[in-house]
Design a protein with these regions (language model features):
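Extended non-membrane alpha-helical scaffolds
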Residues: 93-168
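Extended alpha-helical scaffolding segments used for macromolecular assembly and cargo binding
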Residues: 1-98, 105
Length: 168
């Protein structure tokens, strides 16, 4: 059946992308991941397809950062797509990572207000889930964003909260 063949071809393209990444062949990896995504999108829309696309988009983002730059519009679009798919599938951890990646794009672009907004979203997400690892990452975003914006007391408070969670 055609759908099964496409699903299998998508897996092979994903594996080719992973192999290209392992060999530092970022351009080739991007091409493989983009082809895999395009094949996947020809399959019927299901939650599983959205999950698979989120994983492929995430992998694409990693390779794309190397060739387009962390501040690129193309990379921001990939992270936005992962965030959207993660919301639709209820994958909070992947959504958190996508938001964190968007924060990183905004920091690289010196877009401090946007970085603060994304940081607030990360903090709310981490606190609502109650995951200490996510909370530590959200605090890292918070103190990294507050420090350069001239808020030393808030930065210190955020660092103290993070330090209390840190367990080497």
């Amino acid at each position: 059946d055609v759908a099964r063949c496409l699903a299998r071809a998508t897996q092979h393209r994903q594996r080719a992308g992973q192999l290209a990444v392992s060999r530092a062949a970022s351009r080739e990896a991007v091409a493989h991941y983009q082809h895999a995504i395009s094949q996947l999108l020809s399959l019927p829309e299901t939650i599983e397809r959205k999950r698979r696309e989120a994983g492929l988009q995430d992998a694409l983002g990693g390779a794309l950062a190397h060739i387009a730059g962390v501040e690129s519009d193309a990379l921001a679009q990939v992270h936005q797509r992962v965030r959207e798919l993660s919301r639709q599938t209820g994958d909070v951890k992947r959504q958190f990572v996508a938001e964190w990646n968007l924060w990183h794009v905004h920091v690289a672009r010196w877009e401090h207000r946007r970085a603060e907004t994304v940081g607030s979203s990360l903090m709310a997400m981490a606190e609502s889930v109650g995951d200490p690892e996510l909370l530590l990452q959200a605090l890292h975003v918070e103190w990294s964003t507050l420090g350069p914006s001239g808020q030393p007391m808030a930065t210190r408070s955020s660092c103290d909260r993070g330090w209390a969670l840190y367990d080497p």
